[in-house]
Amino acid sequence: MKNYKKMKTKIFITGTSGFIGFHTAKKFLNRGYLVYGYDSINNYYDVKLKKARLDILKKYKKFKFTKGNLENKKTLNKSILRFKPKIIIHLAAQAGVRYSIEKPDKYLNSNIIGTFNVIELAKKINVKHLIIGSSSSVYGANTKFPFKEIDKTDHQISFYAATKKSTESMAHSYSSLWKVPITMLRFFTVYGPWGRPDMAYFKFTKNILNGKKINIYNKGKMYRDYTYIDDIVDGIFKLINKVPNNKQSKKYKNDSLSRVAPFRILNIGNTKKIYLLDFINTLEKVLKKKAIKKYLPMQKGDVHSTLSDTNLLKKITGYNPKTKYQIGIKKFINWYLSFYK
């Protein structure tokens, strides 16, 4: 701990054994930052994959890690107070729209109580900037595309989305009351190497290779704003010093900056409409194997389509996603074949 003052800004990242958290931590470590990771390493999906991600991070001398639940305030408190970070990037959450229908209590504990604990500690140590992962699922039943940050988000259709919307409201109230600078990031369908096995593209790849059926909901008549992980992480990296300040006059069109708090919501996506069947077709081409398709009705909790407007993030940071989904799929499959050989 004695040498920390000689290093760059300290970054505390929750969810470092998870998909986005792992890549985010790796980005900051590669840039010379000191990173403290925190994760429960739960068994929602393959623990071996989570540990493999962590093993890579642990090779960095500037990486420290504590295993713990977000709900365990004592462990979280000890980690943050000891490290005293200037930036907190809160990416840990119970993910998955469909699982939230089966186990809503897990989402209440991790996403709401856990996020409350992080925000409370951020207030306590007077952080420079708290960045919290939200989700495009908060747009719910909205039918006006692309989604803008200033759009109303009153009709979530999954409990997962409801917990994410709740964290946004909770964060805004804390930011208003205690002047904690907070940015909420609404992620749009993130994919890529080291991804989550519960996500459709991961399941599709596994089943196509094993000659098993893939379930295609709503007969494939839907689209997503698939966003490659490197573009997501680049956006997060560029954002850390862009601290919201409501005392300044708004500089941007359609700015989501709060009138009463140093609080802003930002979309982070690829801004491209990718139809599900086109995505599957690309998987088939790269794998050189046809999928056995099973068409099913729309599933509970799923939204029909998503599409981001990221003009605000672009104006603030210069964010410019560069990865075409065809290239991103190739990179994912190359990793998948290597990891599961």
What does each of the following model-derived ranges do?
Residues M1-V190, T323, W335-F339:
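N-terminal Rossmann-like NAD(P)+-binding domain of SDR-like oxidoreductases, especially those catalyzing
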Residues K2-Y4, K27-N30, G68, K206-K341:
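C-terminal substrate-binding subdomain of Rossmann-fold SDR/epimerase-dehydratase oxidoreductases
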Residues V47, K51-L54, E168, F202, ...:
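Short, surface-exposed alpha-helical segments at coil->helix boundaries
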Residues T75, K106, I113, K152, ...:
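Residue-level recognition of oxygen-bearing side chains
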Residues I131, V138-K144, K179, G195, ...:
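Proline-centered turn/helix-capping motifs that create local helix->coil transitions or kinks
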Residues F145-P146, P197-T205:
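A glycine/serine/threonine-rich, flexible loop-to-helix segment
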Residues S166, M170, Y174, F204, ...:
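Hydrophobic alpha-helix immediately C-terminal to the catalytic Tyr-X-X-X-Lys motif of short-chain
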Residues T189, P193, M222-R224:
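Heptad-repeat alpha-helical coiled-coil signaling segments
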